Regions:
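Catalytic histidine-centered segment of alpha/beta-hydrolase-like enzymes
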Residues: 274-286
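Active-site loop/oxyanion-hole signature of alpha/beta-hydrolase fold enzymes
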Residues: 17, 66-108, 291
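Conserved HGGG/HGGXW glycine-rich cap/lid loop of the alpha/beta-hydrolase fold
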Residues: 25-74
Length: 303
């Protein structure tokens, strides 16, 4: 049976500075601590449901996709770069506060969105009661022993994304691609189809489906990761941050595992990794990721 996302209690749109709009979905307990939950590059927040469903009974869960992803209508020009993403995030945070009222709020981010949340927090300002970062693509500064490994990793992803298939005749076609890929084959049963459904939209000409996040937009984010010079210490944030990486010791694991372990140690973070996981740890081992989430939120009086 396909995994079905429950209907949200409320939806609203956040208008961005260039005319793009972010579709916000409010789930869970409206009286609870608020959690803003989103996704990684080329993916979509709905596909993380097997992770965030565990938060619905206690928390006010606001789920959203970054521009040109998921339930949002892509825009032209795409303005698909980190400098824009952090301004978008600021707009989202402020609009949520206006629309839903002030509340203790934590952010839960993965990969690209985690990197954007880091950049937002250190460059624009701290807007959270706590921040949880799942396997951000943290690139050390040049000269660091792990810089080259991350450079190779991001360059490979950039080239892969540039050549990525854009059009599919059916959702099943992309589902099978995810199932056959070494990088995505470890996802929990049912998530391959859910992810495919979440990242595809009907083609304008009605001939099938196409990726919401165009391959050139996905590639641009991978390439820009090498230019951010963002390797902050935990003390540079205005509040508690939890850094959770994929398994740095896992055979075939991405370079983000060792990089986040290094940042965790060198930067003085509250750091953990999830054993036996690759980059999509929240949908490979959602139960363990939820355990770490609740432990961290509880430690800071939010759960």
């Amino acid at each position: 049976m396909p995994i079905e996302i429950p209907a949200p209690r409320m939806t609203f749109e956040v208008p961005l500075e260039d005319g793009a709009r972010i579709v916000m979905r409010r789930h869970g307990n409206p009286d609870g601590v608020r959690l803003l939950v989103t996704h990684g590059n080329g993916f979509a927040a709905d596909a993380y449901y097997l992770y965030w469903r565990h938060l619905l009974s206690k928390f006010d869960v606001v789920v959203f996709d970054f521009r040109n992803h998921g339930r949002n209508v892509p825009v032209v020009p795409s303005n698909h770069r980190y400098e824009q993403l952090i301004r978008d995030l600021e707009r989202v945070v402020q609009e949520v506060k206006v629309k839903l009222g002030p509340r203790q709020t934590a952010g839960i981010f993965h990969s690209m969105s985690a990197r954007a949340a880091m950049k937002h927090a250190v460059e624009i300002g701290w807007r959270w009661d706590a921040l949880m970062l799942f396997d951000p693509p943290d690139v050390p500064l040049k000269g660091h022993p792990l810089y080259t490994a991350m450079e190779v990793f991001e360059n490979k992803l950039t080239e892969w994304a540039k050549g990525r298939r854009r059009h599919f005749n059916s959702i099943d076609e992309l589902t099978e691609e995810y199932k056959q890929s070494r990088a995505t084959g470890r996802w929990v049963e049912g998530v391959h189809e859910l992810m495919a459904r979440s990242v595809l939209c009907r083609s304008a000409d009605g001939s099938g489906y196409e990726l919401v996040c165009a391959p050139e937009n996905e590639a641009a984010i991978y390439a820009q990761a090498l230019t951010l010079d963002l390797w902050p210490k935990a003390s540079e944030f205005g509040g508690p941050v939890k850094l959770v990486g994929c398994d740095p010791n896992f055979k075939g694991a991405p370079a983000t595992g060792p990089a986040n372990q290094a940042l965790g140690i060198e930067g003085g973070y509250d750091y953990s990794f999830v054993e036996g996981t690759g980059h999509l740890l929240q949908i490979e081992k959602p139960d363990e990721c939820i355990r770490l989430t609740l432990e961290f939120l509880g430690k800071h009086g939010l759960a």
